[in-house]
């Protein structure tokens, strides 16, 4: 049986007691089934030459490494998060391309390949995750690795007009073709990648999703990531902490609109605040009878764009509360702090509306978690952006354009007044999809397809080691 090697920018520590979600749950499920290695950055800066830190529990080994301060700045802060993240979320105006950062990004991917190489066994299959590691298969191929290597992109893939604006777009595209299997959240993302590829070179497609570009064979497929619906339902249904129980009792006659995500410009938070203001303005009958709570803990707080959005939200929340607030009623609660994930599941369950309106999102698991946390006999309503990957699956949500505040306001009004029978029907339809496409099915489908790939021959690999594009000067 093939061993599984998972490679990601960060690894979840084996002693992590906090409720893991998303990538960690799926990866651990796959590793437990096959046995293997999880390899990635420790999250710490220090001496890169130190030996790997290894921990083994059962049939899984965790191997982590430190990054130097310079590599952390170039690879992680300046290229991954100041170039790729904004570009892949359609925000070219926020891209800050610097050649030293690009060189650092490539340098760290090469360093990771050097560190992983001695750990790879002949029949291992390798599963690489996300935008931090786009060149990683290429670096392994240069070192003679012919194993099956798959890649899953958790964030959107932009259209050619966006992607080709990146100075190293040609190199990145060719490097991606060194993976055997490329997985995307949605069909739109998969097609955007192929469109970008076709704009740079000839692409031969066989059987729909098998391709050849630059003489390299690879496959593309869609794997929408899921959640653990049963676990979330269990967390949501447990007893309420005393403070939350008291708050629920105090607000028994108030309908609650709830949102939670990390503070990020891709999430559409300023637009969401303005849509809530439009609800209060266009549907004044709700004033004094609803409350919107937005939880948005700070992330990447050292980046100017994130500081700017935090200040903007603080200003907008104060302005809206000052304009519409009444004695005894505050219309908007904005909390810039972290909450325990299990507590959030309970808050989801007692919210009448889940408001999830990113401007662009690969999937958005919060939308799925909100549905899974509901009481099937009295569920809340999900208002969901058409630009979230989850909108392709959760078609029974109220789908909105987050750029149209009046559209979002109308959907909120509809959600707040929706009859119980319709709420139950919509929730049941969405929950059925979530259960069928849970996190375990996601990883099982990907691993199955990767195992079916024919390994690359050393002869073909030797041909592929010659890069078509020169490196950026």
UniProtKB/Swiss-Prot annotation:
Site entry (Involved in alpha anomer selectivity), positions: 85, 155
Summary of subunit composition and partner proteins: Homotetramer.
GO terms of molecular function: alpha,alpha-trehalose-phosphate synthase (UDP-forming) activity
EC number(s) recorded for this UniProt protein: 2.4.1.15
Residues reported to bind D-glucose 6-phosphate: 10, 76, 130, 300
Catalyzed reaction equations: D-glucose 6-phosphate + UDP-alpha-D-glucose = alpha,alpha-trehalose 6-phosphate + UDP + H(+)
Pathway connected to this protein: Glycan biosynthesis; trehalose biosynthesis
Protein known as: Trehalose-6-phosphate synthase
Pfam family, one: Glyco_transf_20
Protein's UniProt keywords contain Translocase: no
Positions of the UniProt region annotated as Disordered: 454-473
Role this protein plays: Probably involved in the osmoprotection via the biosynthesis of trehalose. Catalyzes the transfer of glucose from UDP-alpha-D-glucose (UDP-Glc) to D-glucose 6-phosphate (Glc-6-P) to form trehalose-6-phosphate. Acts with retention of the anomeric configuration of the UDP-sugar donor.
């Amino acid at each position: 049986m093939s061993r599984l090697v998972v490679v990601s920018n960060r690894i979840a520590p084996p002693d992590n007691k906090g409720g893991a979600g998303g990538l960690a749950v799926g990866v651990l499920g796959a590793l437990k089934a096959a046995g293997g290695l999880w390899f990635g950055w420790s999250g710490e800066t220090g001496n890169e030459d130190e030996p790997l830190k290894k921990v083994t529990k059962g049939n899984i080994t965790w191997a982590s490494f430190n990054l130097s301060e310079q590599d952390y700045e170039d690879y992680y802060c300046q290229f991954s998060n100041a170039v790729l993240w904004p570009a892949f979320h359609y925000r070219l105006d926020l891209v800050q391309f610097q050649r030293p950062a690009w060189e650092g990004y490539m340098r760290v991917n090469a360093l990771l390949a050097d560190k992983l190489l001695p750990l790879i066994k002949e029949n291992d299959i390798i599963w690489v995750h996300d935008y931090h590691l786009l060149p990683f298969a290429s670096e392994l191929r240069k070192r003679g690795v012919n194993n099956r290597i798959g890649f899953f992109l958790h964030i959107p893939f932009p259209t050619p007009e966006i992607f080709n604006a990146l100075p190293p777009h040609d190199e990145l595209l060719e490097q991606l073709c060194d993976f055997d299997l490329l997985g995307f959240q949605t069909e739109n993302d998969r097609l955007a990648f192929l469109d970008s590829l076709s704009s740079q070179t000839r692409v031969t497609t066989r059987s729909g999703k098998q391709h050849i570009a630059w003489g390299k064979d690879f496959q593309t497929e869609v794997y929408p990531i899921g959640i653990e619906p049963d676990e979330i339902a269990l967390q949501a249904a447990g007893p309420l902490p005393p403070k939350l129980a008291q708050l629920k009792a105090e607000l028994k006659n108030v309908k609650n609109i709830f949102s939670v995500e990390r503070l990020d410009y891709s999430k559409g938070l300023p637009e969401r605040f303005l849509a809530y203001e439009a609800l209060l303005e266009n549907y004044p009958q709700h004033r004094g009878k609803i409350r919107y709570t937005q939880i948005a803990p700070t992330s990447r707080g050292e980046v100017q764009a994130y500081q700017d959005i935090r200040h903007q939200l603080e200003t907008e929340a104060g302005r809206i509360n000052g304009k519409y607030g009444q004695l005894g009623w505050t219309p908007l609660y904005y909390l810039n702090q972290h909450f325990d994930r299990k507590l959030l599941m309970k808050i989801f369950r007692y919210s009448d509306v889940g408001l999830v309106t990113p401007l662009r999102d690969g999937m958005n698991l919060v939308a799925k978690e909100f549905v899974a946390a509901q009481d099937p006999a009295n569920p809340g309503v999900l208002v969901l952006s058409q630009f979230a990957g989850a909108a392709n699956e959760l078609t029974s949500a109220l789908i909105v354009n987050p750029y149209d505040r009046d559209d979002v306001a109308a959907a909120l009004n509809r959600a707040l007044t929706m009859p119980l029978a319709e709420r139950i029907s919509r929730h049941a339809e969405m929950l059925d999809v979530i259960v069928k496409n849970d996190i375990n099915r996601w990883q099982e489908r990907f691993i199955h397809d990767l195992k079916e790939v024919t390994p690359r021959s050393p002869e073909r690999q030797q041909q592929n080691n010659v890069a078509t594009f020169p490196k950026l000067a």
